[in-house]
Amino acid sequence: MREKPEGGKGMAEHTPLMKQYFAAKAEYPDLLLFFRMGDFYELFHQDARKAARLLDITLTQRGSSGGAPIPMAGVPVHAYEGYLARLIALGESVAICEQIGDPGLAKGLVERKVVRIVTPGTITDEVLLEERRDTLLMALSRSKNCYGLAWADLAGGRFLVNEVNSEEALEAELARLEPAELLLPDEDAWPEYLQQRNGVRRRPPWLFDADSGRRKLLAFFKLHDLSGFGIENNPQATAAAGALLGYIEETQKQRLPHLTSITMETVGEAITMNAATRRHLELDTRVDGESRHTLLGVLDSTVTPMGGRLLRRWLHRPLRLREVVRQRHAAVGSMIDRDLDNKLMETFRRLGDMERILTRVALRSARPRDISTLRDSLSLLPRLRELLNASDSPRLRVLYAELGEHDSTASLLVKAVAEQPPLKLTDGGVIASEYDVELDELRKLSNNADQFLIDLETRERESSGISTLKVGYNRVHGYYIEISKGQADKAPVHYTRRQTLTNAERYITEELKAFEDKVLSARDRALVREKLLYEQLLDTVGAQLEPLKRCAAALSELDVLVCFAERAQTLDWVRPELEHTSCLHIEGGRHPVVEAVREQRFEPNDLDLHPERRMLVITGPNMGGKSTYMRQNALIVLLAYIGSYVPASRALIGPIDRIMTRIGAGDDLARGQSTFMLEMTETSYILHHATAQSLVLMDEIGRGTSTYDGLALADAVARHLAHINRCYTLFATHYFELTALADETYEGGLSGIANVHFDAVEHSERLVFMHTVKDGPANRSFGLQVAALAGLPAAAVAHARRRLAELEQRGRESHVSEITPLALDAPQQCSLFASAPSAAQEALVALHPDELTPKQALEALYRLKALL
């Protein structure tokens, strides 16, 4: 919505400054406008009110314009980045309107111009970025049967696209990538969960046109076709990429030389995990929103931020490309065998975030310490290449080549950049001495000023007889001679008063004025020269951008592989064996997170699944270890397929296309789904998508409804998974009746279902959980003992024991011991979809079998069949 001038007046009634403000604001009505005024960025009117609320800064007024007071809030220029970071974290976008030229030389109103737009998905400044997490901008396009996705990591120089054919797959990709900002065509019928996300930007639908997107991409990358990127026949991906690129160009207002290609990801390359699975497995965020005690928290020993970001990407996209994964395993093994990981890790400790530094070099926003960090990082390459030179690992040989030789660039930066440069170029002292003759001469002139001032102060004290006389300098008034008030009457007649203070007078002389002009001119010229030399360095480094980006990518991968090697040795993990045939055989498996955080020894457990044993029905007491066991096996599979070693004594793992979970309970209030509806929605997704190569975890299906409904649903789901989907399934249940599935046959053969259980023993009135998986079904649930452990009042537990005894007795008398006893005197829940009896049912009820002859019985059977 465009902001209108307040006060009910037209633009003609406003001051020139406010006219300038409203003109800039009209271009960016939906953004907060940082309007540069001297040493502050000011915000006015609605922007001021909003910023004051979000940043907890003072809301004030700046006179009036158009007959109304002007609400105003501001942040100092020297500290604006901290405020900007807070606004970006809240999902806000900011347009920065700078003063153009020197305000001191301007005649009348200073010219101002929006030079930069900062949005949650387009930030590249180090202070605004999370060090170990990608900041992604994403655009979505859609047709009837397809969604196109394009996303860019501007800070890392990556540009990727994908196409998916369902809303579920789209949601899975969003859960994986977690974009900071999402561009959508301004159309109806987008899913509600998309519209409720932070950072959603509605854009005109015509910007998402495939043909215009193709033209934009061809022009940007200077190509004749897109076949080299593999997206020539992907119109929705092309449309999304074009819309994304247009937004980036619109907000960045400059060339983007670090975006040099587009990568097409395909769903079939990776193991699919939907949003629920990522949430249940707590890969990098726990269900309660915390990031501690997650798989990433245990796994991540990377040294560099760019290695940490790559590890997070790998963790969320385990590959189905077994040869790629095997090469990672081999690289880790080679490092361990040759003790390379320790040597490489020690070297990596001196590496900087080259990936993001190179982006800032390309965007001309690199700061002096970025360049010194790049210099120090490049200087480490000879040592890294020496360590990798004799490696027998194919992947390490590739990475050795990708590192490249950058001796000339490193040598240039060593000569050109000061050992410890200042934070800002304008502070001076960035370029090293003896690099440029002209700069050295200007600095010499400036540096000699100190001795001149010492000599001048000594001479003036002697000639004036004022022992407390001082010669000094400040940025406002320049050089001065200061005399205390008590001795001001002794000031020589050739002193000209420059400034009066409370306790002193400051003067200037012709000699000091001449020196000031000479020195300040030299300093100004030195800064101008230094700026020119610095920009030349950026040009030189920028010319090597592509090989340097490949070097940074290789360093990132090496950091992750070193992390895997270190974790394998520290945590006693083993190299998994990836099989071509269907199997999931794990010996001595452990849960990586639980083992890391608990003080007691973790009890390892085995898992054995194959085509004749596809499902384990897992029974046992609550807190006995069922959920931990299921999750640990899923995490072991995931770790294996990102290239890591795994927490087990041996692991043979066949092809896996999906990891799917239905674990835990909790309402999804945002979508209006109850616990049971959420359970059924996730279960439905699994039944529709699981294949014979999928790993499925099902925890306590059916507990959200009545006992009979729950048992019936659990039975049906288990049979469907075992006989229709035929996937690897770990099925934890409190319905003991399901253990009978293992004894059934299916289509003349074994059911493919086996029983395992976790046990507990009562010892000295205490319940001890064994946490060991055993063959066969459990014989007790220990529900009351667990309730007592949880702190239920003793009276309540005692009452429950008496009630349980009564129900079990009634169950035995009624010969329905198969059904959960508690259901016997509970009212049964009616089905929402109960229907009237069918004609066949009514005919069957009317039959009296004892009164029928064999011929009549046969005729009745045919009539019933006809009614079905």
Curated annotation (Swiss-Prot):
InterPro entries, per database record: DNA_mismatch_repair_MutS, DNA_mismatch_repair_MutS-lik_N, DNA_mismatch_repair_MutS/MSH, DNA_mismatch_repair_MutS_C, DNA_mismatch_repair_MutS_clamp, DNA_mismatch_repair_MutS_core, DNA_mismatch_repair_MutS_N, DNA_mismatch_repair_MutS_sf
Any one GO molecular-function label of the UniProt entry: mismatched DNA binding
Short name of any one Pfam family annotated for the protein: MutS_IV
Binding sites annotated in the UniProt record for ATP: 620-627
Any Gene Ontology biological process: mismatch repair
NCBIfam families, per database record: mutS1 (TIGR01070), PRK05399.1 (NF003810)
Protein name according to UniProt: DNA mismatch repair protein MutS
Source organism: Xylella fastidiosa (strain 9a5c)
Taxonomic lineage of the native organism: Bacteria, Pseudomonadati, Pseudomonadota, Gammaproteobacteria, Lysobacterales
